[in-house]
Amino acid sequence: MIALLLAQAAVAATPAWKLADRTNPAGVRSISASVTGNDGLSRFVVKCDVGTEPIVSIQFIQPQSLGQGADKPVAVRFDGGPAFTYSWQFPGTGTYIIDPEAITRLTTFLVKSKTLRVETTNGAGFAVQANFAAPASDAMVRQVLGVCGYTLGVVPPPPPPPPAPKDTQ
């Protein structure tokens, strides 16, 4: 009986992934799958924003500022394995990456894992890290990626170049 109660408590303590799908008054759709970290404060987000063009991002959000500044390395580890390190953008309290190859690799590993860990530094150079539960299935991540035209596990082709200006002479 005690083992059953402990098992139920462990399941209840695992943060659940949540899907949010919104459209703002300007018609920009934003859909995301996110989870709160084991610390109860950090968040890991897979997001698609569809405005003039679709943009997929992976975001790591902290309650304390990570510092605004130049891009810097962020490492993501799945199930305690080797780090996948990419250069992420740092606008302030969070950090994000929009590189399609990185998004593809990170989401592919994310949906096959049980846990993930994000490691970086804040604006003062101090280590910042957070642990998260991976999603129980790939459904939410597939849904988010699909809205932006991505297929899980497939790097999308680059967008076509803009049309050349017409000669007015």
State what each model feature region is.
Residues 2-13:
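Hydrophobic h-region of N-terminal signal peptides that target proteins for export
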